Amino acid sequence: MFNISHKLTSKLPFQIRYIQQCPPPKYDTGCTYCNPPSEMEENLKSPPESIRNTIPPLNRLIFHRSGNKDHDNWPKKVEVFDIMRNISKFGRGNGNMICMSSLSPINEMTTNDQQNVDFAIYPDAQTISINGNDSTELEKLFKIINSNDSNNSISLSKHFRASKIDKTIVLICGHTQRDIRCGVLGKIIHKEFEEVLKRENLENDVELGYISHVGGHVYAGNLVILKPNGKMFWYGMVRPHHVQGLVDQSIKSDDLIEELSRQ
């Protein structure tokens, strides 16, 4: 787990265009102005002047496409799962953030194989299928990753079954057992994304799911937008009324909204 008690500077390797404020919503989906229960509002942090530079300095984001949709019951520490414990053993440190997602495996062989698992790696925007119980393979994977910083894209297809990611991915922190604030907010943000993506005819172009702890539950409403070009947009303190602006600026375009940015 990353310690983000003080502000840190991201090592993300690409240029990003900024806009200062999130555009207001153009329509009400029925979820746009939903709020968490009033008793939870008291426990949510008031927006500070800025939440910039509150993600850790990243080399790579690596997340398991677990297919486990029951994010409310993910254990507080996902390392309880063998695959997460194994991958964390070899991958922790060196600026790697390792998480679990609710996204389903993309390889049929992986889906039907109890040993092979799918991981997505950014900013390389690649998915690999790997034997999560094979320490030799895991060690080999992280030797490659750790010998190349995020400014240097790596070609994993030379060593593993790998494929480029061709869709935008939106992952919302909904790790309820880690922090109830993220569990509750994550659900209403997820619902609004579903409605907006449908209205904008983007549901086939964007994968939407949940991700485990990414640091900074104090900024509940955390999410990351991952683009096929490798760009990553880290946001915090998101509410449903921000979603249309995020879709317009960071999914349809490559702009980062500064008031919600954690990078």
Protein language model features and the residues they cover:
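Histidine/cysteine-enriched polar flanking segments
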Residues: 2-263
